Amino acid sequence: MFSRATRSLVMKTGGLRTQGTHSPGSAASSSQRRMTPYVDCYAQRSYPMPDEPYCTELSEEQRALKEKEKGSWAQLSQAEKVALYRLQFHETFAEMNHRSNEWKTVMGCVFFFIGFTALVIWWQRVYVFPKKVVTLTEERKAQQLQRLLDMKSNPIQGLSAHWDYEKKEWKK
């Protein structure tokens, strides 16, 4: 692995540096590589109170409000307190935990694809699959049963055992 001298050199310099692809020749600093927990402009429910504020670049009004924050909070109005909160966090807990209406879109897509599948199956039954075989009609099934009974097939335990040949009906 690393020798003791190499390890101490790495620790002193802050680690192995790699050159960025956007700025060849200069090493990327750790502050440039660090990403804030606010990804896609919203606080994550798993990490609701990040170390870094939401707004890092402040305007003149916001800087003045930050200076006023250092004084007594009793002198701040409700709107100023809300503005200070919005500088630190993007959303409140209520906004963060608010349910979205995304389930309606998901259910709509699910029902659309179920309906589309049903239409494809109906189309296949009407136009693709062959017609029913003639031997599956009720008339032909009755003729097949009568033929089995006339041949007296399996007279001990089969169909012929349950048929009364004298009365021409099923035994009760």
UniProtKB/Swiss-Prot annotation:
- Signal peptide as annotated in the record: none
Compartments reported by the entry: Mitochondrion inner membrane
One GO biological-process annotation of the entry reads: cellular response to hypoxia
Gene Ontology cellular-component annotations:
mitochondrial inner membrane; mitochondrial membrane; respiratory chain complex IV
Membrane topology designation: Single-pass membrane protein
According to the UniProt entry, which residue ranges have a biased composition of type Polar residues?
Answer: 16-33
Q: Which InterPro entries match?
A: Cyt_c_oxidase_su4, Cyt_c_oxidase_su4_fam, Cyt_c_oxidase_su4_sf
Q: Does the keyword NADP apply?
A: no
Which regions of this chain are Mitochondrial matrix-facing, per the record's topological domains? Answer: 19-101
Keyword Mitochondrion recorded: yes
| Annotated transmembrane regions | 102-127
Judging by the UniProt lineage, the source's domain of life is Eukaryota
Record pathway: Energy metabolism; oxidative phosphorylation
Question: Transit peptide, first to last residue?
Answer: 1-18
Outline which residue ranges sit on the Mitochondrial intermembrane face.
128-172
Q: Name one Pfam family in it.
A: COX4
For this UniProt record, the keywords arranged alphabetically read as follows: Membrane, Mitochondrion, Mitochondrion inner membrane, Transit peptide, Transmembrane, Transmembrane helix
* Record-stated family: Belongs to the cytochrome c oxidase IV family.
Q: How does it assemble?
A: Component of the cytochrome c oxidase (complex IV, CIV), a multisubunit enzyme composed of 14 subunits. The complex is composed of a catalytic core of 3 subunits MT-CO1, MT-CO2 and MT-CO3, encoded in the mitochondrial DNA, and 11 supernumerary subunits COX4I, COX5A, COX5B, COX6A, COX6B, COX6C, COX7A, COX7B, COX7C, COX8 and NDUFA4, which are encoded in the nuclear genome.
Q: What does this protein do?
A: Component of the cytochrome c oxidase, the last enzyme in the mitochondrial electron transport chain which drives oxidative phosphorylation. The respiratory chain contains 3 multisubunit complexes succinate dehydrogenase (complex II, CII), ubiquinol-cytochrome c oxidoreductase (cytochrome b-c1 complex, complex III, CIII) and cytochrome c oxidase (complex IV, CIV), that cooperate to transfer electrons derived from NADH and succinate to molecular oxygen, creating an electrochemical gradient over the inner membrane that drives transmembrane transport and the ATP synthase.
What name appears for this protein in its UniProt entry? Answer: Cytochrome c oxidase subunit 4 isoform 2, mitochondrial
Origin species, per record, is Rattus norvegicus (Rat)
Q: Which gene encodes it?
A: Cox4i2
